[in-house]
Regions:
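Residue register of alpha-helical TPR repeats
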Residues: 2, 37, 77, 117-119, ...
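Residue signature of alpha-solenoid helical repeat architecture, marking inter-repeat boundaries
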Residues: 33, 73, 113-115, 155, ...
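"A position-specific structural signal for the A-helix of alpha-solenoid helical repeats
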Residues: 6, 41, 74, 81, ...
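Alpha-helical segment of the N-proximal tetratricopeptide repeat
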Residues: 2-29, 45-48
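Amphipathic alpha-helical segments of tetratricopeptide repeats
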Residues: 21, 25-29, 63-67, 100-110, ...
Length: 210
């Protein structure tokens, strides 16, 4: 990663989106960038601006670069990011197709990586929830939690519990929704993620799980 990209990421994490974009564009253009971290940052910056065409371009070039280099690690990341752009646009069906494509790659190259599977299963569950497929959403979200609990990644665990809470709340199984939302809050607190805690509390208010 170049110093420019490194510094641009710092700006982005500090919430200085405009500064991050201005710095990145001094040296790179999304149409020609051949740096994974740069393309990834372009995608985040364009999503922030709701410039989805450019965000899609950044992620598509990321996947193309990974495939050209036969880099399975970067390819699965690129597919996941591409799905996130479609998710941000509300195109849950296309996002799910890409997450399923990522799952096939994981099965081939990362079959024992519990964290990667947890993240993929979470998206499969979340997207199916958005598509109204509650039964399959629950299946994948439970699997996400199972995989997350085999790691020491508290954020993955917190996200899976939160996802289960949303599915149970949507299904009006309020006791299980409250239990899983509270477990999510506990995991986010252990990870010192105050934003994550607040997001779950907001969900509980939205679903009237109080």
């Amino acid at each position: 990663m170049s110093n420019t990209i490194d510094k641009a990421w710092e700006f982005f994490f500090e919430g200085k989106v405009l500064e991050a974009k201005q710095l990145l564009e001094k040296e790179y253009q999304v149409e020609t960038c051949l740096d994974y971290a740069g393309l990834n940052l372009f995608a985040y910056l364009y999503i922030e601006e709701e410039n989805f065409d450019k965000a899609l371009l950044a992620c598509q070039r990321y996947v193309q670069l990974a495939r050209k280099e036969q880099n399975a690690e970067q390819e699965h990341i690129g597919l996941h990011q591409l799905a996130m752009v479609y998710r941000s646009q509300g195109d849950f069906k296309k996002a799910l197709e890409l997450i399923e494509e990522e799952a096939m790659l994981l099965a081939t190259d990362f079959s024992e990586d519990k964290l990667k599977w947890s993240v993929n299963d979470y998206e499969q569950g979340y997207l199916r929830l958005q598509l109204g497929e509650l039964e399959s959403a629950l299946h994948f979200m439970k699997r996400s939690l199972e995989n997350a609990l085999m790691t020491d990644d508290l954020i993955a665990q917190a996200c899976a519990y939160r996802g289960l809470g949303e599915i149970y709340a949507t299904s009006r199984i309020t006791d299980l929704a409250e239990q899983t939302f509270m477990k999510s809050i506990t995991a986010f607190e252990e990870a010192n993620d105050d934003i994550g805690v607040e997001e779950v509390r907001e969900l509980m208010t939205t679903y009237r799980i109080i």
